[in-house]
C-alpha cells in the first residue's frame, strides 16, 4: 500500500460535506493499494446545456480524486495543491453515473502526478485526465 495517511471510505466521504464535491454528488467508492475511485451522477447537476456530461464536471471529478490521493501521500503538517489539470474527452455521457479511477504517475517529495480515467457505466473510457500537485509544508 502506498498511502501515508490511512483513511476509511467513510472518513474520505465525510471530507466532502458542505463542499462542491457533495453538491456534484461525488462519492468515494474504492480505496486500493495504489488506487482511489469515486462515482459521480450524470444528471442536472453535471449536465451541460445540451444534456451531456459537462467537461468541467469530469475535470472536477478528476481534481477531487487526484487532490485527495495526493493528500493521502503526505505526512502531518503537509498538504497538496493542484498545479495543472489536463483533460481529454473521448466520448459523451448523457445519463447514469461515471466512475473515476486515480493512480499515481510520479510521487516525488515536492510534486506528484496523477492519472485519472473516467469511465461510463459500460466501462468505456470517456475522459483521461492528468493532475499535477505540489506538496507544501
UniProtKB/Swiss-Prot annotation:
Pathway: Siderophore biosynthesis; enterobactin biosynthesis. SUPFAM superfamilies: Thioesterase/thiol ester dehydrase-isomerase (SSF54637). The keyword Amino-acid biosynthesis does not apply. The keyword Cytoplasm applies. Homotetramer. Dimer of dimers. Interacts specifically with the aryl carrier protein (ArCP) domain of EntB. Belongs to the thioesterase PaaI family. This is Proofreading thioesterase EntH. The gene is entH.
